[in-house]
């Protein structure tokens, strides 16, 4: 199926108007249903802004409850509460949530409807096909952050803390304390990837006193991090050989590398686990199927760890969901400008005004979809 960016108002469906009066829409906030997902993509503050702009806001009951936002707060902000996701999909022009669409949602998508959520198309081909088949307009929320995703920052920081929890003896780990104690050495931690996630993890682990090595393929990033931390961290180029060299003395590895789809190699294969001491920890924050860690398989907050070759693996896919209040506030603040641009000006005009928004825009070819409003 062909996918493209719409560049003509004559080929854009619902919400394509170029002024506020024409493009008033019904905004729908779903309750996320992914296992262990407690975040919301819009707090009552964002709902109040959307209503003040002249739009109708529908909120599914319980959408923000696990993140600390009660239904009554959404009502006070001007939202109308509805009971089911079917109510949202059936009435809203613009539908949003945090995580990917679940298969039970595929039949509810409709032509011309605007969907703003994480899609991760490389890992979810069935979801992509459902979007194409429905004729809806989808925006990939995971790509919408100009200055780095607050969820990536949260995943790095909280992932580091989850790794430290996994290191506890009661969880199968070595039982080492991060900064060490009088007469006992600090943990040695290896961070793979020096991007937003890796830097966030580094900030926590360094502050807590771990001895940290960061690996990346970009020597410029490594130089910058060395300067930022006054030469108190180690850096190396990220190669399988360098990783193997460090693993025998490493207590915890954090994988923060976004692995290219279709790559048939690993940074840490199963045989390399034997280089690590019993009770060592791997935290796979990137969480890519067929990714950098061969022994990876996805886990949940309810059952977050497994042990393979004596190494504790923590592989929860939605780590930021564990700090739902903070991540919801940060995430919602980062996406509300996109929401307002689309709601107030329509899809076409919003994309014309902000070329960055075009990068998130996914839909069937214009010739397959006619304007519905």
What are these model-predicted stretches?
Residues 15, 21-130:
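An N-terminal-biased, well-structured beta-alpha scaffold segment characteristic
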Residues 88-101, 240-265:
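Rossmann-like NAD(P)-binding element
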Residues 15, 26, 32, 106-186:
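Glycine/serine-rich phosphate-binding loop and adjoining beta1-alpha1 elements at the start
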Residues 101-115, 262-278:
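Rossmann-fold NAD(P) dinucleotide-binding segment
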Residues 142-162, 166-177, 292-363, 367:
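Adenosine-phosphate binding glycine-rich loop
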Residues 37-52, 58-59, 177-250, 255:
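Glycine-rich phosphate/diphosphate-binding loop of Rossmann-like nucleotide-binding domains
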Residues 1-8, 361-368:
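Conserved small/polar residues in nucleotide/adenosyl-binding loops
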Residues 123-140, 281-312:
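Rossmann-fold NAD(P)-binding glycine/threonine-rich loop
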């Amino acid at each position: 199926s062909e996918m493209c960016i719409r560049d003509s108002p004559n080929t854009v469906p619902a919400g394509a108007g170029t002024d506020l009066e024409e493009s008033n829409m019904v905004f729908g906030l779903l309750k996320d249903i992914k296992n262990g997902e407690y975040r919301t993509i819009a707090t009552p503050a964002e709902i109040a802004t959307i209503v003040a702009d002249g739009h109708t806001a529908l909120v599914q009951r319980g959408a923000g409850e696990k993140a600390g936002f009660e239904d009554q707060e959404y009502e006070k902000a001007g939202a109308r509460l509805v009971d089911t996701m079917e109510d949202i999909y059936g009435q809203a022009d613009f539908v949003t949530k945090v995580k990917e669409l679940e298969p039970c949602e595929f039949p509810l998508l409709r032509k011309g409807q605007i969907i703003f959520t994480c899609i991760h198309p490389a890992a979810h081909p069935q979801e992509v096909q459902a979007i194409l088949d429905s004729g809806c307009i989808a925006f990939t929320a995971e790509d919408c952050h100009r200055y780095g995703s607050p969820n990536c920052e949260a995943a790095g920081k909280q992932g580091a803390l989850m790794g430290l929890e996994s290191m506890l003896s009661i969880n199968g780990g070595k039982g080492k304390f991060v900064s060490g104690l009088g007469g006992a050495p600090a943990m040695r931690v290896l961070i793979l990837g020096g991007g937003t996630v890796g830097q966030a993890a580094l900030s926590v682990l360094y502050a807590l006193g771990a001895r940290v090595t960061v690996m990346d393929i970009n020597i410029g990033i490594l130089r910058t991090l060395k300067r930022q931390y006054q030469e108190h961290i180690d850096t190396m180029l990220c190669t399988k050989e360098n990783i193997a060299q460090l693993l025998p003395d490493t207590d915890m590895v954090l994988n923060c590398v976004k692995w290219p789809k279709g790559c048939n190699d690993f940074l840490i294969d199963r045989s390399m686990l034997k280089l690590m001491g019993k009770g060592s920890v791997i935290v796979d924050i990137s969480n890519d199927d067929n990714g950098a860690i061969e022994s990876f398989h996805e886990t949940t907050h309810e059952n977050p760890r497994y042990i393979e070759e004596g190494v504790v693996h923590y592989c929860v896919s939605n780590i930021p969901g564990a700090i739902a209040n903070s991540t919801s506030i940060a995430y919602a603040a980062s996406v509300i400008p996109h929401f307002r641009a689309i709601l107030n000006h329509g899809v076409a005009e919003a994309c014309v005004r902000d070329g960055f928004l075009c990068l998130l825009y996914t839909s069937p070819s214009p010739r397959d979809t006619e304007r519905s409003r």
